Amino acid sequence: GIKDWIKGAAKKLIKTVASHIANQ
């Protein structure tokens, strides 16, 4: 459902931000 999609999107966003910070 929507909640599962939001959880998945949040995890992807966190991974993207974390890797972006690590690359700096």
Curated annotation (Swiss-Prot):
The keyword Secreted applies. GO terms for biological process: defense response to Gram-negative bacterium. One of its GO terms (cellular component) is extracellular region. It comes from the Eukaryota. Expressed by the skin glands. It is found in: Secreted. Keywords: Amphibian defense peptide, Antibiotic, Antimicrobial, Secreted. Signal peptide: none annotated. Antimicrobial peptide. Synthetic peptide shows higher potency against Gram-negative bacteria than against Gram-positive bacteria. Has a very week hemolytic activity. Belongs to the ascaphin family. This is Ascaphin-5. It comes from Ascaphus truei.
